[in-house]
Amino acid sequence: MGLGDYSHCRQRMSRGLYGVSGRAALWSPVFHPVHRMPCGTWRIGIEVPEHVRASSPVLEHLRRQLERAFQRAAARGRARRAREAVAAVAAAAAAAREERSRTRMECALARLRAELLELRFQNHQLARTLLDLNMKMQQLKKRQDQELASKPQSPQDKEMNSECGSA
């Protein structure tokens, strides 16, 4: 499509809006967003002269209110994003603290397990030593009983042995 295809639009704009002279300056065509060409619909232009703005204080007041509302909305958005960032940092710090705490507890548990294994090993060694001593005592007692049985004993020795054995 060339520029010549829109000659009918130029003719309509030159004679005014639908033949009404003097009003064409306040109206501008709506442009298609992709091609930036007039689409055939009309609306009031955005560029309003200063004397028109001053003549409508209500519109100026509304414009200022909208401007302030947009500024407040933008500030709230920035504040919300800042709060979310702070919350994310706090959550990350809490997760890091939790991880350090969990690591410390795991280390403490590992030390306690190692100590428990050491104590079990020592307990096993002490039990074996006690069994060895008990067996030696039994062997010594048997040997002593054999020696006493092989010796002739006097009546006094028998009384002594019976007293020691009963005591």
Swiss-Prot record:
One of its GO terms (biological process) is response to testosterone. Transmembrane segments: none annotated. Residues 140-167 are annotated as: Disordered. Preferentially expressed in testis both in embryo and adult. Expressed at much lower level in other tissues. It comes from the Eukaryota. This is Alanine- and arginine-rich domain-containing protein. It comes from Mus musculus. The lineage of its organism: Eukaryota, Metazoa, Chordata, Craniata, Vertebrata.
